Design a protein with these regions (language model features):
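Non-ligating segments of multi-cofactor redox enzymes
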Residues: 1-357
């Protein structure tokens, strides 16, 4: 994900929400969300809720966020009552919700204020904290592509997975008392199509492919040029979503409103907190390649990031998935109630539903 091109339009969020999480106990979930940084994020203060692994590789204790206080309870607009009913004084004050602090920057305007957007999905980690925390072995990582999924037949809703995930990108469905998460739109990628969030991104910030595909743009951004970095790699989960750090902020102004040449409006210590010490080299490479493009008109890296052709951003070989399915004797993306939350749950699930006030 190229953070220099994200405009915070939430089209990716809407694409995911309308496809996966607008019904059946998932209403409060945002498998994809776009956060304003610096900000509290979603769920609230997720970076402070624990989980992940320490330097010795031991799973760290984490906190399960509260649905109402930390995620925000979704609502339906009562359009008919508002439009045709009696005029009443509102008696409910909103207290929290996704993107509560959207577009709220920090610093002093206009000298050094800033913010930028961070789109977040499940990182489909190589060493998932959610998987390690689950006592039911209900979370598994697919061998063919590394997608991390929840087996809803095995899940008992203990929520250890939520505590174990340092990114808090796995959620509890109170309707079926089970945990659910981003599935990277695997029915789409098995057909050679990108996830809905990536397909609908108007800023063309999302590249999707295999890390070992040396001809792919993901490989070139992560391994060849090393300008795409994982978010909070210090959590020890080896996340597989990579970010090109923001370098396009204007310089700072001094007290008289004059430009301070060479100044960074976004503090480098904040970027290092998010993306680790390698962010300095990544930013140097990005700036050097940009100058190279200006001077010579040529830069493979800049061409990749500009993303002239939408289809070039996604390298998902349908034939690969078909060969795997044939070898294993399975059908691709079967219609399976395990991935249809709330469907026929009256007979399928016998677990207690947690009620929230």
């Amino acid at each position: 994900m190229d953070l220099n091109k994200c405009i915070g339009c939430q089209t990716c969020t809407v694409a995911c929400k309308t496809q996966w999480t607008n019904r059946n106990g998932r209403e409060y979930m945002y498998w994809n969300n776009v956060e304003t940084y610096p900000g509290t994020g979603y769920p609230k203060n997720w970076m402070e809720l624990g989980g992940g692994f320490d330097a010795a590789g031991d799973l760290q204790a984490g906190i399960v966020p509260n649905i109402e206080a930390d995620y925000g309870v979704p609502w339906d607009y009562n359009h008919d009552e508002l439009q045709f009913g009696a005029q009443l004084k509102p008696n409910v004050e909103p207290t929290w919700g996704p993107n509560w602090d959207e577009d709220e920057g920090t610093g002093d305007f206009p000298n050094d204020n800033y913010f930028f957007y961070i789109p977040r999905i499940c990182n489909h980690c190589t060493n998932p904290g959610c998987l390690s925390a689950c006592p039911r072995d209900a979370i598994f990582k697919r061998e063919q592509d590394g997608v991390v999924l929840v087996d809803l037949d095995r899940c008992q809703g203990y929520r250890y997975c939520i505590a174990g995930c340092p990114y808090k990108k796995i959620y509890f469905n109170p309707k079926i008392s089970k945990s659910e998460k981003c599935i990277l739109c695997f029915p789409r990628i098995e057909k050679g199509l990108p996830p809905a969030c990536a397909q609908q991104c108007v800023g063309r910030i999302r590249f999707v492919g295999f890390l070992d595909d040396e001809e792919g743009q993901v490989y070139k951004l992560v391994h060849k040029y090393k300008v795409a970095l994982p978010l909070r790699s210090d959590y020890g989960t080896q996340p597989n979503v990579y970010y090109v750090p923001p370098t396009e902020a204007p310089p700072k102004f001094d007290a008289e409103g004059r430009v301070i040449p060479g100044s960074d409006r976004i503090p480098t210590e904040e970027l290092e907190k998010l993306f680790g010490p390698e962010v300095h080299k990544a930013m140097q490479t990005l700036r050097a390649e940009k100058e190279k493009r200006r001077a010579t008109g040529k830069s493979e890296l800049m061409d990749i990031l500009i993303a002239y052709k939408h289809e070039d951003m996604f390298r998902l070989d349908q034939n690969y998935y078909q060969s795997i399915a044939k070898k294993q004797g399975i059908s691709l993306a079967p219609i399976d109630n395990r991935y249809m939350a709330g469907k026929n749950t009256e007979n399928k699930y016998k677990f207690k539903v947690v009620e929230y006030d």
